[in-house]
Amino acid sequence: MRHLLPEGWPRPKGYANGIEADGRQVFVAGMIGWNEAGEFAHGFGAQLAQALENTVAVLKEAGAGPEHIVRMTWYVTDLDAYRNDLAAIGAAYRDVMGKNFPAMAVVGVTGLVEKDALIEIESTAVIEQ
């Protein structure tokens, strides 16, 4: 896996501009902040942590882990809440995902299918062979 950083560009903080990888691909559907009983965590940070833990659980089924993620798209219902809590978001991310920073996008949305969901995260992983 190789992080792509064009010459002269500043190093991004908390994500990669691009990643090149060869191997077996794993696609993780949109994970939200509820547990296996369908109960939502309370608040954005708690839902983020649960959505990340759910992502890791799905990856584990494929023999993968957070270190294999090459792309994430986060859909958030409140961009202001996201922007105002970046330090806590970063800490929650590192607690679950470690220091793997894939190509990422954060997209503001007016709502998600599950009305109590505050965030939904899609991921793509590559297990190098």
Model-derived features: positions:
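N-terminal presequence-like segments and the immediate start of the first folded domain
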Residues: 1-70, 76-129
